[in-house]
């Protein structure tokens, strides 16, 4: 006792030390501290406990750590470091993830006692020892029976009688001491990937009441002292745990694999037993326990399923007809070996069955071989078509329990041949006191319902443990009256009453709820994903276990969490009538319902937040697409208008253009200018500055305001020189339209404008629109070349003809119309300041204000960077070409001179010479 209590307190001490040093000490230092303070066996024990606790979290990567627990290292120091690193890592994962696993961590003795009390209340009444019989800590270490109904560790009353059946610990020096393979039965499974039905893992022959244990238990309270890693064994522990019947066997991987080479199918399989409500009283009278443990129905999981018509699944060809194969309890056991760990089922895995009730198979029927309803194996059909009345013959009541079975009755229920006759009508349910006709569907239908209801109970993490194999049993509460009232702590009674008392009313509700909205489909999909884990097969809650919709009697929306919550509420209210004499169970079920509601609300809120974020992205994308479509339309329309304006202005006379072009441009700017001003995209430059706007957006804005600037050949000078309506990036002048031919007016406006805010933008846009309406006679005349020379400073060469053809359709080069019109009178470009000064003379001298108002010279303006394409080295190449051209000219001139001289000589000199001679 004292040694066990000290061991528990010792574990609590280590956990408290981890918690205190978690945020202050580094990972490496914490591992070193653990290695220095504790022995390997203690660290291995703590790792095992932390691993089982963390497996309660479905997001815990159990497979990674399980592989580490399998490996054996000969070097003790290396193993110690690995174990310490695993301890720190698992502890940090538990602390970060929170939830169930974090709540299970005992941080103090008081917390350990509280957890024990809660776990004691979760177990079935036949297995819980009275609080007055044992102390809390000792209850945890030595008095916990395993929840499947194999009390290898008995209460202190019965310790002396049954202590020989307790397992023996393996010493820590054993290399494979983390791999426990004994006959001790556990309730959960962290799979070692071996068939549980195989028995030759130990030397001694198995007893009928025992089952091969090849799985780690998943409940920390049920397995506080792990059988894999032991603390130093004291005399008190030896008296409790040393088994005289059979040693604790650990076999190598070669031996385990050799099993499959042998004739292991003919070996004896084990049969788990059922612990009834009268179990404790019979044990006190000394009746052998092996007689009572033969009433356990087989449980199975199809993680190791065989092909369709295997002889080992057929009772006719079964080599062991008198033994039942034990397989996994449920799909949870398979999930325990997956990456995400076991499903978050909070309660213990007790069967919570009473001996008088018709023991039935777990609500998980056969695995889905396919989605085709016709492709169902024979043993599955026999499973669905069986009758609980046969089970009554096979599994008797508590009043007429018999220690032995006849040979044919020992077959598992799912191996019963199809041709067995039904003893009772389908409308009758088996009860201990006789046959009762109930207004419910047949038990076969109920079993089909349960496969689906099982999903829903797990999807909200119901803590009552309703996934046990008796949830679809018809008789539930009648047998409970033989129990003492102080021991009625079964939290699952609400779920049992729910399934028994409201099948009639819920069946009609199922048919009415046919239509489900999108959010229900989302919830159902998420539930299926959370249930399936990483097994790769989504066991959809809309289907039954064979993947058949035709065999399903439930509506589609039955599996949604909203409907699930309503079912729980109805179940609790319906079960209150049967449990008026058990108020504490009602209280427990209400607390359980509240916790389930809280978890469901939190989950709904989380999913809603995710959906809101997705909805926001979708709205933004739709807005952006809509704006792009509008911009494309606005780009196409002004281009058509401006092409007509350019053609008219080039062919028409000046007086008609002076009167017509302002009207056309006013219509264009009035229709498109204010719209652009009010759109959100054009307002971003005031906040984010010059770097926030993309080049495309700036070009689009500029193009919409600069297209109408070409009037006619007479107004071409002032239009191209000013580049009207350019958009500057600074808030001061981004909408201020400046005309160099209206310097007196625009200079005052620029000075008085100051930093503009949102209120001034509409006013400025209207002013910009009014500027286009100014009659031409008020504009001051300018020299033709004055506007071009400023641009020619940073416009080294005109556009090539091939580039123009490509750029005419590109919205980034929408000011090409200006340069095209300018090329009519554009002279030779200026390459340096001397040429520029020589070409312009006095007219080329620009004031500081001129430089500020000219868009082509303003680095903050987009036109400064997008005016022309300048190729580096182009001027040197051009000068070389010019030099070659000059050289060719000189050569031509020299050739002409030489030819002329030769001609003169030949024509004049030669005849003269000939004449003289």
Swiss-Prot record:
- What protein name applies here? Major intrinsically disordered Notch2-binding receptor 1
Q: Which gene encodes it?
A: Minar1
Which compartment or compartments is the protein found in? Cell membrane
Q: Where is the composition biased (Polar residues)?
A: 460-476
Residue numbers carrying Phosphoserine: 712
Lineage, top ranks: Eukaryota, Metazoa, Chordata, Craniata, Vertebrata
The UniProt keywords, alphabetically, are:
Cell membrane, Membrane, Phosphoprotein, Transmembrane, Transmembrane helix
Question: What's this protein's function?
Answer: Intrinsically disordered protein which may negatively regulate mTOR signaling pathway by stabilizing the mTOR complex component DEPTOR. Negatively regulates angiogenesis. Negatively regulates cell growth. Negatively regulates neurite outgrowth in hippocampal neurons.
The highest taxon in the source lineage is Eukaryota
Source organism of this protein record? Rattus norvegicus
Where are the Extracellular topological domains?
914-917
Which InterPro entries does the UniProt record give? MINAR1-like, MINAR1-like_C, MINAR1_N
Q: How does it sit in the membrane?
A: Single-pass type IV membrane protein
Tell me the segments the record calls region Disordered. Answer: 337-367, 389-410, 457-476, 568-588, 652-679, 706-727, 746-783
Task: Give GO cellular component annotations, separated by semicolons.
Answer: plasma membrane
The UniProt induction remark is: Up-regulated by NGF.
Q: Which family does it belong to?
A: Belongs to the MINAR family.
